[in-house]
């Protein structure tokens, strides 16, 4: 699914501008969910705010497949769009915000459950392959939803079967792989260290053992990407 943004161009991420928001919030909790998502996205360094679909295509045109960014959606029903460079060019996927969670928009005819997350960063991380895993799986033989979920053909030895996702666009079946975010600015050393620490904290007990100020700093951005 390809979208085209109607928002004004902007090369860098910037504070939330409510004048650009055409979609209304369904509740106070949804408003808070989106505000928190924007705050973390601005910390991420790969939130390009109001760049257009055409500008996203230009930004990703010279990048390898798997490079991605998050931008504001042009669709009045959605807040964010995931733009990703695939083996068949740049594709734009809307990020839905419903029922207090975010998910990638999928084919409504699909009976498969769509992964949902309380944070856009968690959604992005879910679709990224683990370290050492092959980037692009072989397409399944049976068609499914627009972003369907199928077992990977060759999981790593000793690891559970990976899930592979595919984009169905214009009759094409394209692997959805998020390998590397496209940075919109230079990350601080503190942020780089925080991402590294987040990637090594695999249990809540480890987090509770850290000093209070460090825990608070990590809570402000709790993703390894």
Swiss-Prot record:
<protein>
    <recommendedName>
        <fullName>Suppressor of cytokine signaling 3</fullName>
    </recommendedName>
</protein>
<dbReference type="GO" id="GO:0043066">
    <property type="term" value="P:negative regulation of apoptotic process"/>
</dbReference>
<dbReference type="InterPro" id="IPR035863">
    <property type="entry name" value="SOCS3_SH2"/>
</dbReference>
<dbReference type="InterPro" id="IPR000980">
    <property type="entry name" value="SH2"/>
</dbReference>
<feature type="region of interest" description="Disordered">
    <location>
        <begin position="131"/>
        <end position="162"/>
    </location>
</feature>
<comment type="pathway">
    <text>Protein modification; protein ubiquitination.</text>
</comment>
<feature type="compositionally biased region" description="Pro residues">
    <location>
        <begin position="131"/>
        <end position="142"/>
    </location>
</feature>
<comment type="subunit">
    <text>Interacts with multiple activated proteins of the tyrosine kinase signaling pathway including IGF1 receptor, insulin receptor and JAK2. Binding to JAK2 is mediated through the KIR and SH2 domains to a phosphorylated tyrosine residue within the JAK2 JH1 domain. Binds specific activated tyrosine residues of the leptin, EPO, IL12, GSCF and gp130 receptors. Interaction with CSNK1E stabilizes SOCS3 protein. Component of the probable ECS(SOCS3) E3 ubiquitin-protein ligase complex which contains CUL5, RNF7/RBX2, Elongin BC complex and SOCS3. Interacts with CUL5, RNF7, ELOB and ELOC.</text>
</comment>
<dbReference type="GO" id="GO:0046426">
    <property type="term" value="P:negative regulation of receptor signaling pathway via JAK-STAT"/>
</dbReference>
<dbReference type="GO" id="GO:0045597">
    <property type="term" value="P:positive regulation of cell differentiation"/>
</dbReference>
<dbReference type="GO" id="GO:0072540">
    <property type="term" value="P:T-helper 17 cell lineage commitment"/>
</dbReference>
<dbReference type="InterPro" id="IPR036036">
    <property type="entry name" value="SOCS_box-like_dom_sf"/>
</dbReference>
<keyword id="KW-0582">Pharmaceutical</keyword>
<dbReference type="GO" id="GO:0050728">
    <property type="term" value="P:negative regulation of inflammatory response"/>
</dbReference>
<dbReference type="Pfam" id="PF00017">
    <property type="entry name" value="SH2"/>
</dbReference>
<feature type="domain" description="SH2">
    <location>
        <begin position="46"/>
        <end position="142"/>
    </location>
</feature>
<dbReference type="GO" id="GO:0005829">
    <property type="term" value="C:cytosol"/>
</dbReference>
<comment type="function">
    <text>SOCS family proteins form part of a classical negative feedback system that regulates cytokine signal transduction. SOCS3 is involved in negative regulation of cytokines that signal through the JAK/STAT pathway. Inhibits cytokine signal transduction by binding to tyrosine kinase receptors including IL6ST/gp130, LIF, erythropoietin, insulin, IL12, GCSF and leptin receptors. Binding to JAK2 inhibits its kinase activity and regulates IL6 signaling. Suppresses fetal liver erythropoiesis. Regulates onset and maintenance of allergic responses mediated by T-helper type 2 cells.</text>
</comment>
<dbReference type="GO" id="GO:0001784">
    <property type="term" value="F:phosphotyrosine residue binding"/>
</dbReference>
<feature type="compositionally biased region" description="Low complexity">
    <location>
        <begin position="143"/>
        <end position="155"/>
    </location>
</feature>
<dbReference type="InterPro" id="IPR028414">
    <property type="entry name" value="SOCS3_SOCS_box"/>
</dbReference>
<dbReference type="GO" id="GO:0035556">
    <property type="term" value="P:intracellular signal transduction"/>
</dbReference>
<dbReference type="InterPro" id="IPR036860">
    <property type="entry name" value="SH2_dom_sf"/>
</dbReference>
<dbReference type="GO" id="GO:0060670">
    <property type="term" value="P:branching involved in labyrinthine layer morphogenesis"/>
</dbReference>
<keyword id="KW-0734">Signal transduction inhibitor</keyword>
<keyword id="KW-0833">Ubl conjugation pathway</keyword>
<dbReference type="InterPro" id="IPR001496">
    <property type="entry name" value="SOCS_box"/>
</dbReference>
<dbReference type="GO" id="GO:0046627">
    <property type="term" value="P:negative regulation of insulin receptor signaling pathway"/>
</dbReference>
<dbReference type="GO" id="GO:0019221">
    <property type="term" value="P:cytokine-mediated signaling pathway"/>
</dbReference>
<feature type="domain" description="SOCS box">
    <location>
        <begin position="177"/>
        <end position="224"/>
    </location>
</feature>
<feature type="region of interest" description="Extended SH2 subdomain (ESS)">
    <location>
        <begin position="34"/>
        <end position="45"/>
    </location>
</feature>
<dbReference type="GO" id="GO:0030292">
    <property type="term" value="F:protein tyrosine kinase inhibitor activity"/>
</dbReference>
<dbReference type="GO" id="GO:0004860">
    <property type="term" value="F:protein kinase inhibitor activity"/>
</dbReference>
<dbReference type="GO" id="GO:0035198">
    <property type="term" value="F:miRNA binding"/>
</dbReference>
<dbReference type="GO" id="GO:0005126">
    <property type="term" value="F:cytokine receptor binding"/>
</dbReference>
<keyword id="KW-0341">Growth regulation</keyword>
<dbReference type="GO" id="GO:0060674">
    <property type="term" value="P:placenta blood vessel development"/>
</dbReference>
<dbReference type="GO" id="GO:0009898">
    <property type="term" value="C:cytoplasmic side of plasma membrane"/>
</dbReference>
<dbReference type="GO" id="GO:1990830">
    <property type="term" value="P:cellular response to leukemia inhibitory factor"/>
</dbReference>
<keyword id="KW-0597">Phosphoprotein</keyword>
<keyword id="KW-0727">SH2 domain</keyword>
<dbReference type="GO" id="GO:0016567">
    <property type="term" value="P:protein ubiquitination"/>
</dbReference>
């Amino acid at each position: 699914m390809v979208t085209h943004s109607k928002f004004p161009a902007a090369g860098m991420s910037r504070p939330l501008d409510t004048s650009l928001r055409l979609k209304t919030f369904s509740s106070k909790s949804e408003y808070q969910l989106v505000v928190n998502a924007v705050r973390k996205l601005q910390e991420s360094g790969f939130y390009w705010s109001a760049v257009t679909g055409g500008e996203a295509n230009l930004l990703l045109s010279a990048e390898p497949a798997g490079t991605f960014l998050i931008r504001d959606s042009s669709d009045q029903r959605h807040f964010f769009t995931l733009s990703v460079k695939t083996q068949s060019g740049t594709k734009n996927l809307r990020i839905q915000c419903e029922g207090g969670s975010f998910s990638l928009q999928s084919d409504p005819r699909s009976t498969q459950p769509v992964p949902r997350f309380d944070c856009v960063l968690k959604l992005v991380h879910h679709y990224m392959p683990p370290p050492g895993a092959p980037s692009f799986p072989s397409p399944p033989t049976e068609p499914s939803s627009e972003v369907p979920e199928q077992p990977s053909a060759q999981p790593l030895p000793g690891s559970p079967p990976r899930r592979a996702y595919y984009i169905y666009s214009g009759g094409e079946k394209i692997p959805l792989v998020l390998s590397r975010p496209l940075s919109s600015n230079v990350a601080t050393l503190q942020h780089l260290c925080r991402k590294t620490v987040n990637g090594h904290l695999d249990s809540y007990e480890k987090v509770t053992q850290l000093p209070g100020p460090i825990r608070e700093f990590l809570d402000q951005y709790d993703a390894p990407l």
